[in-house]
């Protein structure tokens, strides 16, 4: 799984540094906040417009489960997003103790394997015990024993020349696996994530097509739009739900 480990971290690095992705991410954040606030205000407006319920009503006959419970489903999704951001996004961006990706290699003539930081460029490896951690001071009295490399965040510098020589990966893979495999909360985190994806599927199932209806799109493409919306509402949450299930129950 070493290759999967690195591929996951390569993907995470791309998603957090690519300018186009970052712009789309911020647009998405703003859109979600606007959608949440707008939905909340619309719910309040509807309650004020009709504080007393209809004397006779049969909602099940007029609408589906998702459309009748959009506010509840939306609230659950918002709670999930906040939880997800705290456990993964915030750690990736702001946690000073975020682990860096390492790999163990047994060198010729060495009885025990050594840990190496994995560089973002092909073939870049830095022996962990020869690198100063971010903020660490080298107290070695013998100049020959002093470490030649130091970390500043994820950037690797040559100590003597004070020149950046490369970068290493933040280990989001480890954070993710540890979270879903945690002996105490792993099963609850896994089931909670899957439940959130189930809720998201319901929300998207109704929301995708209702959004086009609200925009007045009603033509020969309407059946296709509805089909695409339903496929999207099922496939995307399903693929995301598979990740924690695989990590918790299959990954060794």
Predicted segments with their positions:
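Membrane-embedded alpha-helical bundles that constitute the cytochrome b-like, heme-associated redox core
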Residues: 1-252
């Amino acid at each position: 799984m070493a290759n999967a480990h690195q591929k996951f971290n390569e993907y995470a690095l791309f998603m957090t540094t690519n300018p186009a992705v970052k712009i789309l991410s911020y647009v998405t954040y703003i859109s979600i906040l606007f959608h949440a606030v707008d939905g909340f205000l619309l719910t309040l407006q509807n309650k004020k417009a009709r504080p007393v319920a209809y004397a006779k009503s049969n909602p099940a006959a007029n609408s589906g489960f998702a459309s009748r419970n959009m506010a509840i489903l939306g609230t659950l999704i918002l709670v999930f997003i906040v939880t997800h951001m705290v456990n993964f996004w915030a750690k990736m961006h702001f946690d000073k103790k975020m682990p860096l990706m390492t790999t163990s290699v047994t060198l010729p003539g060495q009885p025990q394997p050594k840990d190496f930081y994995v560089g973002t460029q092909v073939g870049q490896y830095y022996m962990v015990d020869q690198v100063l951690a971010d903020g660490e001071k080298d107290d070695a009295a013998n100049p020959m024993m002093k470490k030649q490399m130091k970390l500043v965040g994820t950037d690797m510098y040559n100590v003597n020349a004070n020149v950046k020589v490369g970068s290493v990966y933040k280990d989001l893979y480890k954070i993710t696996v540890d979270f879903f495999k945690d002996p105490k909360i792993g099963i609850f985190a896994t089931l909670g994530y899957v439940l959130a994806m189930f809720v998201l599927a319901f929300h998207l199932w109704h929301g995708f097509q209702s959004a086009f209806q609200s925009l007045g799109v009603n033509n020969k493409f309407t059946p296709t739009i509805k089909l695409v919306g339903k496929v999207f509402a099922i496939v995307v949450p399903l693929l995301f739900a598979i990740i924690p299930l695989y990590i918790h129950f299959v990954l060794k």
